[in-house]
Amino acid sequence: MQEYWIDDEQSKKDILDYIKENAVTPKLVDNSSGVFTYKVSDFIVKSLSELILNDEVKYNPLIFGKNNTENIVSIGHLNDSFYLFKNDGSHEKIPGTYYILGDKQYNPKFKKLEGKNFYKFIREYNSYSEFLAGKKESYKFGGWSPRDPIEGLMLRQGYTYFKGMKAQEPSVLAFDIETTTSNPHHDGSEVVLISNTLRKDGVITKKLFDVNAYISDRSMIEDWAKWVREQDPSILCGHNVFSFDLDYLHVRSGRNLVIGRLEQPLVFADKPSHKRKDGSQSYEYYNATVFGREIIDTMFLSLSYDVGRKFISYGLKPIIEQLGLEKPGRIKWDFKADPVSEIKSNPEKWKQFREYCEDDGDDALALFDLMIPSFFYLNQSVPKTLQQMINTATGSQINSFMVRSYLQDSHSIAKTTKAESFEGAISMGIPGIYENVRKVDVASLYPSIMIEYDVYNKYKDPKRHMLKSLEIFRDERLKNKEAAELTGVKYYDDLQNAQKILINSMYGFMGAEGLNYNYPEGAALVTEKGREILLKGVKWATGREIIKVVKKIVNEGKENEKKTYEWVLDDKIEPSQGYTLVNVDTDSFSYVSDGQPTKEQFKKEIEQLNAIFPSLITWADDGVYSKVAVLKTKNYILKKHKDWCKPKELDKDGEPKITLKGSSLKDQKKEPALKEMLDVLIYEILNGNNKDKINTLIHKYQDEAMNVQNINRWCVKKTYTEKMREGEGKIALDVQNAVSEALNAKVINRIQEGDKIYLYNAVNGERQKKAKGELQFYKDGRPKMEKNTILKFPELFANDFNVEHYLERIKDTAEILAGVINNE
């Protein structure tokens, strides 16, 4: 390995320039002999003094932005000026401009950027109003500009938040309000309590504002706003604050809620935004900004944190309870029995209610502390505010990262590429129950493919920034993961989790729509290589190819003909290990041989498998399973051998937990009774698979469904969404009617988008049948009638459950397991 000595200022400058231009991180490997030795890319750098790791290269400009300013907790934009706020409470005005990029020099004020990417010219403005006028004009020629001035500043100048800080350092005020109504515009609306938990410099301060101590709630809110300005927190957090708390306070304050730094008011956006939950569901809200502070809505934070969609509800109290964060002895309040509007004048009740509310801020702060670290540390690299990190999708964050990597050096930036559909990964299962199943997977398959096969867009990304950053994040994550395991220090685990988010999102970013640096062709290439790797692995194990065949043809021979495909095993067998394939799923496959292997045997098998692949494509031991039940493609049940279990994979009795894979098995909306039925049937299938016993179990639930005593066991969970609130289909209308009935009966006091509700299927008399929108009649003119099925809240249960519906649901649930139930 070539050595390079730093022995004067010029040699120091040369190596610093190399590090900056190539976006590499120098690694100190030795300084025991008085010589500082660093590994930089593929050569060794030596110096008699610590010349490399100084402020100039402390933060890799590709990863953290070129500006090394530390302890930034917020950036504000006001009156054509930018303000930078630091953790010590200081602030300064910093230079910055607004800008529009174009593909041509549309007038002499457009200046040429470096490089050959699409947006080659930049027009900069000192006036925000002039910029807005120019932006409106730029739509005619397809110009590009940042979404907001603050992100624009960060993209152009390389600022990022929280450099040199840890997640617990910024000051945080968690708050919650109690009100008399659900809508601040209704008669009798009033904010009666504001609970606060402030953490600043490691010290917790709690304060409760009570409307009874003021002449009106407006005067209380003004006093609270004054207190917020005095305490000067960098972060405001609360649960569902965008849609409820801040909106309510804003209205009740006369739309002049001055809680920002430099005496600035809260500002709501004119147009709605959407917080995405998953590919099919999002929540509409109006974004709010507070000058010099970040607003973190812990409901949105929970949505981003709950990747596995395990929360039964996104309400604050249910999440706190589910996560085991509830304060011991915490007072609970029954709002139905004692609504806020009726207890304010009852001194004893009010005293109890105050005690209940005093800890409300603690709950939001507990969620913040648990969930924020990964986003906090990722924010040190991504040129967005912390608030934007929570409210936006990962693809947008990576895109900003990539734009910054070029624009901060006045380099032209890319134009988005139209996304196209492409073939995905291989998934197939051979139904049946298997014993002693080996499972192998490729660690970080898609990122590994990107690096191994050099997958990046040579035209859009000429300096290879995407792959360089991916390599750096991968290497740093491995170091932090190892440090976390060796030391048990949470900081390292938080860092590696942040890095994991970006690493695992790179592939999805390439295939996304509307992003400057997307690369759909590259995403297709990655999945193609992924399929090749899986096919090669399966052939090594079984000697058989997996081939794609037509599963179904719709409208055959017509213009709108549509074919669906499936993967199956070819009959041809070649020399191999002679194993039997069980399942294939994206980055893994499982197989069986004779008996349970020893750990040494399995290790040798994996070594043999890895010997036929490139170094970065590494197959790993994903466990040996005592039982695996494959139902269909992407739906299977796993029970590990105890010897292969980590402590967290054992239940309270020390037995291996059962893992369910697939939508049919993990449906979170399934009724509790049917979830229970599925669990007991799975247990029986894995422990005997006795057909008579299984039939007896099914009959037990059929009997319960015909005579329901506890309707809560038969309720389905639904999320109250905009589509449900505004929809005109039967399900949406049934939900709207159920909500209206519950509000009128005061079963619920309010409902808002994102709330989880539980409903059961009921019968309310009869209604005339319809077909294609028309009422149906018998030949003699009599109307054809059917049951009038509706949805109801369980609190309104009147022994009116729909027996036929629930018997059908039992049948559907049992049929999920039909392929593996013993039929002998």
Give residue spans per PLM region.
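DnaQ-like (DEDDh/DEDDy) 3′-5′ exonuclease domain used for proofreading
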Residues: M1-D232, L257, E358-D359, D363-V382, ...
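Common nucleic-acid-contacting/processivity interface regions adjacent to the catalytic cores
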Residues: M1-N22, L28, A337-S444, S448-Y453, ...
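C-terminal, non-catalytic extensions of nucleic-acid polymerases
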Residues: K12-L28, N560, F602-E824
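Active-site-proximal helix-loop-helix substrate-binding element of RNase H-like nuclease domains
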Residues: K206, V211, D232, L236, ...
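Short glycine-rich phosphate-binding loop at a beta-alpha junction
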Residues: S234-V241, K551, V582-N583, S590-V592
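Short active-site loop/helix that positions an aromatic residue
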Residues: D245-G254, A443-N457
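Short beta-strand
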Residues: T580-D585, D621
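Catalytic palm subdomain of template-directed nucleic-acid polymerases
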Residues: F589-K604
